[in-house]
Structures are given as structure tokens and as C-alpha cells.
């Protein structure tokens, strides 16, 4: 189980992110892509955590290498869901994934999302994919 103090910090961060997005005019009725961030020094640990997150119903990105300011090499991936911008829904994901990260020996580094313009035209070609086409795939728009 994740440290309760760390969870409370993450819950406060969730409230802050949502509040800032809505204050900036992001669409309160949109479905958002929520990117939870995992990292680890050991690729195998990260991979095992990613597999477990996938089993829980999340999409998972490929691992990428990141060098910290202290020159430590970390392997990172995003654990992705779609959700309304609601504190309780996102905090339930935060708790689930922070607990998983603790169990698997990886870091849960919070979450992020993107601004959703309420005035943007609906994309009729949208096929509800979480990920855009690969660079070598033809674009439909």
C-alpha cells in the first residue's frame, strides 16, 4: 500500500490540476486522456508494473529512457486511461496505481492531461484511439 502522506499529496495535486484546467477554460464536459507516470531504474521492474497495469484495463506506452538532473538513468512509461475531469474518479486511479507502483517497486510520478478546448470543432474522423497513428502510418486528416 502506498504511503498515506504521499497519497494525500497526490490527491491535493489532483484537485490543483483540475482546478487550474477549469480556470483556464478547459471543457468541463470532455473526456480526458489521463497519463499516469511510472519510472524505475530497473527496466524489468517497470515492465512487470506495466503488465499489471495493462491487466487492470489501462493502456501502457512503451518505456523510454530519461536522464535525471543527477545523471541517473530511469526507464519511464505512461499508464493511460480516459476519464471525466472529476476528482473522485481520478483519485481512485491515483490510489490504484500508486498502490501498484509500491507493490511492484517502481515510482509513481503523478499524472497529467491536456487542455480540452470547449470551442474546438468535433473531429468527425476521430476513431477514439488513445494514440495517434505511428509516423509510418498514413494520416487520415
From Swiss-Prot:
Pfam families: RraB. Residues 119-141 have a biased composition (Acidic residues). The keyword Cytoplasm applies. Gene3D superfamilies: RraB-like. Signal peptide: none annotated. One of its GO terms (cellular component) is cytoplasm. Residues 112-141 are annotated as: Disordered. Keywords: Cytoplasm. It is found in: Cytoplasm. One of its GO terms (molecular function) is enzyme binding. The keyword Disulfide bond does not apply. Globally modulates RNA abundance by binding to RNase E (Rne) and regulating its endonucleolytic activity. Can modulate Rne action in a substrate-dependent manner by altering the composition of the degradosome. Interacts with the C-terminal region of Rne. Belongs to the RraB family. This is Regulator of ribonuclease activity B. The lineage of its organism: Bacteria, Pseudomonadati, Pseudomonadota, Gammaproteobacteria, Enterobacterales.
Amino acid at each position: 500500500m502506498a504511503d498515506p502522506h504521499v497519497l494525500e499529496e497526490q490527491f491535493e495535486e489532483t484537485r490543483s490540476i483540475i482546478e487550474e484546467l477549469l480556470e483556464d477554460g478547459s471543457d468541463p464536459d470532455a473526456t480526458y486522456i489521463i497519463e499516469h507516470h511510472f519510472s524505475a531504474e530497473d527496466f524489468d521492474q517497470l515492465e512487470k508494473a506495466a503488465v499489471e497495469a495493462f491487466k487492470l484495463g489501462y493502456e501502457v506506452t512503451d518505456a523510454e529512457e530519461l536522464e535525471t538532473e543527477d545523471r541517473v538513468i530511469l526507464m519511464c512509461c505512461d499508464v493511460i486511461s480516459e476519464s471525466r475531469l472529476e476528482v473522485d474518479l481520478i483519485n481512485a486511479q491515483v490510489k490504484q496505481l500508486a498502490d501498484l507502483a509500491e507493490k511492484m517497486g517502481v515510482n509513481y510520478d503523478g499524472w497529467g492531461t491536456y487542455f480540452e478546448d470547449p470551442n474546438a470543432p468535433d473531429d468527425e474522423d476521430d476513431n477514439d484511439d488513445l494514440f495517434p497513428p505511428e509516423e509510418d502510418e498514413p494520416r487520415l486528416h
